[in-house]
Curated annotation (Swiss-Prot):
Gene: CACYBP
Record-level GO BP terms: heart development
Protein's recorded name: Calcyclin-binding protein
Segments of this protein annotated with the region Disordered: 38-59
Record PTM: Phosphorylated on serine residues. Phosphorylated upon induction by RA or at high calcium concentrations.
Species of the source: Bos taurus
Function per UniProt: May be involved in calcium-dependent ubiquitination and subsequent proteasomal degradation of target proteins. Probably serves as a molecular bridge in ubiquitin E3 complexes. Participates in the ubiquitin-mediated degradation of beta-catenin (CTNNB1).
Subunit structure: Monomer or homodimer. Component of some large E3 complex at least composed of UBE2D1, SIAH1, CACYBP/SIP, SKP1, APC and TBL1X. Interacts directly with SIAH1, SIAH2 and SKP1. Interacts with proteins of the S100 family S100A1, S100A6, S100B, S100P and S100A12 in a calcium-dependent manner.
Positions of post-translational N6-acetyllysine modification: 10, 21, 87, 120
Signal in keyword set: no
Domain of life: Eukaryota
Main localization (coarse): nucleus
Positions of the UniProt region annotated as Interaction with SKP1: 75-230
Length: 230
């Protein structure tokens, strides 16, 4: 394009020279018209050149850098509360500000014996809670979640309505049952006491065993003498 402009510039200068020398009106009018034509063409060429330069400059600009949305690390939720009605087991999770995040940022997936909660990008963090081995089966279709002020409420629909859950999970049930005394509370109280003493004796050290043996001998001697204070 620079070469074309240069040629037009030379044509314009030559027309100007001829126009200065021309004396006849018809010739001068023709040269004046040609001069205007060349000037207009030069103006258009220059505008096109400027436009292309601007486009090249715009294309050379670096693309805007969009900062990635980070959700930080994931916090495992361990604190929660739960209760139940005839139809639902209700799990309450307290998360300050959770009601302010977009609805799609709070996700809960259900299976017949589990659920998992994921809250994304809450104050720069994600929060996760996975509960497996629910005590009893739940209805996946009938289960849901609700987001309230600073709280996520998970509603697990009982498959068998009007049944009571003593524990939330099977694991919790097994742990609690292991903590119960080994003797049967429905048996005779004296038998239960003997079982307790037997367990203490088996688990105790030598001093404990000597103490129990001594108490046992003294008790037997008193019973032989008719003393029933023991």
């Amino acid at each position: 394009m620079s070469s074309a402009l240069e040629e037009l510039q030379k044509d314009l200068e030559e027309v100007k020279v001829l126009l200065e020398k021309a004396t006849r009106k018809r010739v001068r009018d023709a040269l004046t018209a040609e001069k205007s034509k060349i000037e207009t063409e030069m103006k258009n060429k220059m505008q096109q050149k400027s436009q292309r330069k601007a486009e090249l400059t715009e294309n050379e600009k670096p693309a805007a850098v969009v900062a990635p949305i980070t959700t930080g690390y994931t916090v495992k939720i361990s604190n929660y509360g739960w209760d139940q009605s005839d139809k639902f087991v209700k799990i309450y999770i307290t998360l300050p500000g959770v009601h302010q995040v977009p609805a799609e940022s709070v996700q809960v997936n259900f299976t017949e014996r589990s659920f998992d909660l994921l809250v994304k990008n809450l104050n720069g963090k994600s929060y996760s809670m996975i509960v497996n081995n629910l005590l009893k089966p739940i209805s996946v279709e009938g289960s849901s979640k609700k987001v309230k002020t600073d709280t996520v409420l998970i509603l697990c629909r009982k498959k068998a309505e009007n049944t009571r859950w003593d524990y939330l999970t099977q694991v919790e049930k097994e742990c609690k049952e292991k903590e119960k005394p080994s003797y049967d509370t429905e048996t005779d109280p004296s038998e239960g006491l003997m079982n307790v003493l037997k367990k203490i004796y088996e688990d105790g050290d030598d001093d404990m065993k000597r103490t129990i043996n001594k108490a046992w001998v003294e008790s037997r001697e008193k019973q032989a003498k008719g003393d029933t204070d023991f």
